[in-house]
A protein has these predicted regions:
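Conserved beta-strand hairpin/beta-sheet module of binuclear metal-dependent hydrolase folds
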Residues: 35-91, 186-189, 197-200
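Metallo-beta-lactamase
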Residues: 36-37, 135-188, 193
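Divalent metal-coordination and catalytic microenvironments
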Residues: 70, 109, 190, 202, ...
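Cap/insert and terminal regions of metallo-dependent hydrolase folds
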Residues: 82-83, 94-104, 110-125, 208, ...
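Beta-sheet entry/capping signal
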Residues: 76-77, 104, 130, 196-197, ...
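A short secondary-structure junction signal
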Residues: 142-144, 183-188, 199-204, 208-214
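Short internal beta-strands
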Residues: 103-110, 129-139
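Long, non-catalytic terminal segments
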Residues: 2-54, 384-397
Length: 398
């Protein structure tokens, strides 16, 4: 297998055009970077698999979200679409010219709104493509039919219930359905037999110590969180980028990291009013964070230079706290699919070297270690889970 090729950005000094990166539907899910979605396109496996990556997050806590584009005999399959800006569509048209039409669009999760929202617009851009969705789709606060959410009724199919796309080339394996109370978690993994590549959505991630290349297009989130106070400037150097990335990882996994304090309001406002800080890029100097000693060690525990896959902490504690058995069984089923070479999740790093042995080892580790703990860095997530159980929003222990 040829090693993955280096990143090839679609945006740069000469091509970074805001009008080509506009996403008009962002108010339906108002996440950073709002209406402007820069996209990085990387060829992960030569002439076989491509990654379309965009940033997405809250308060500059932004991590990559990925659409995988897989070349099949019939054309191209889009797995977990991202916002189809003009920049994204231009890149897809270029792939179509070389490898055939976009014939299949897959929404591989029932609950991930960030993956669900782009699908109708992507489907309209490729009117000949069949749209496949997981069973148990749901919306909140009202349960609406998919057609009311913009999915094309005449060419939308339900995975497993109405067949499987490209079953002669791909294997499909569901995790779930798992009862979340408000709705259902169901994710379907896809194995490309030819390349040994396993496409996933949210269940597993691999987090590298270095910031993803996507931040080269806009390092602002890294630089914002690399600071200690709001009156400090946004300095761009490798060390600031690494420090900002480690803090972003803590936020994204634990929501409120344990070694983090919120300074008094008057202190935050005093720093915000300092000269030189009154710009939108720095949120006008508002920086309500104070990091305590030990945060680096907690960040390092989430990262792996060898890209070992893991369950994201926020999913383990809020989605899977009472579903360890189902997750472990799914990992063992994935390991039995065949010869595995690469793992491509919809977030963080990709491609990740993988094997059946590595997945079985991860399953063993999850069975043996403490699961969804309550203390230390998990304390805030644990409080959220207990509150949701007490309110009857999510099911409690059985």
């Amino acid at each position: 297998m040829t090693d993955p090729t280096p990143p090839l950005p679609t945006a740069g000094p000469d091509t970074d055009r805001p009008e080509r990166q506009h996403w008009p539907w962002w108010p339906l899910l108002p996440l950073y970077p709002y209406g402007r979605r820069r996209t990085l396109v990387r060829e992960l496996l030569p002439d076989r698999l491509w990654s379309f990556e965009q940033l997405q997050g809250v308060w500059y806590v932004a991590v990559p979200i990925r659409m995988s584009v897989l070349r099949l005999r019939e054309g191209l399959m889009l797995y977990a679409p991202v916002a189809p800006t003009a920049e994204v569509l231009d890149a897809l048209r270029g792939l179509e010219q070389r490898h055939g039409p976009v014939c299949t669009i897959v929404l591989p999760t029932s609950s991930g709104l960030e993956h669900k929202l782009p699908v109708p617009a992507m489907a309209r851009a490729f009117p000949e493509a069949t749209v496949w969705v997981t069973p148990k789709q749901w919306s909140f606060p009202l349960r609406l039919p998919l057609a009311w959410l913009g999915f094309p009724a005449r060419r939308t199919r339900v995975l497993l219930e109405e067949g499987l796309p490209h079953a002669d080339q791909l294997d499909w394996l569901p995790l779930g359905p798992l009862d979340l109370g408000l709705g259902t978690f169901l994710e379907i993994a896809c194995l490309d037999r030819s390349s040994g590549t396993l496409l996933l959505t949210d269940a597993l991630v691999a987090i590298a110590p270095e910031p993803p290349a996507l931040f080269d297009l806009d390092p602002t989130p890294l630089l914002f969180h690399a600071r200690e106070r709001g009156d400090e400037p946004l300095l761009d150097d490798p060390e600031c980028r690494r420090r900002g990335w480690r803090r972003l990882v803590l936020f994204a996994n634990y929501l409120r990291p344990e070694p983090l304090d919120v300074p008094p309001l008057m202190e935050v406002l005093r720093h915000a009013l300092a000269p030189g800080c009154r710009s939108p890029r720095s949120h006008f100097g508002l920086y309500p964070f104070r990091w305590r000693a030990g945060w680096e060690q907690q960040a390092d525990a989430l990262m792996a230079a060898d890209l070992s896959p893991r369950v994201a902490a926020v999913l383990e504690r809020l989605v899977f706290p009472r579903q360890r058995h189902a997750l472990v069984a799914w990992l063992r089923q994935l390991a039995a699919l065949g010869e595995l070479r690469w793992l491509v999740p919809a977030h963080y790093e990709a491609p990740v070297p993988i094997s059946s042995h590595r997945l079985c080892r991860l399953a063993d580790e999850l069975e043996e270690r403490a699961w969804a703990p309550d203390g230390g860095p998990w304390e805030f997530l644990s409080r959220i889970d207990r509150a949701l159980v007490d309110l009857g929003v999510v099911p409690g222990p059985r």
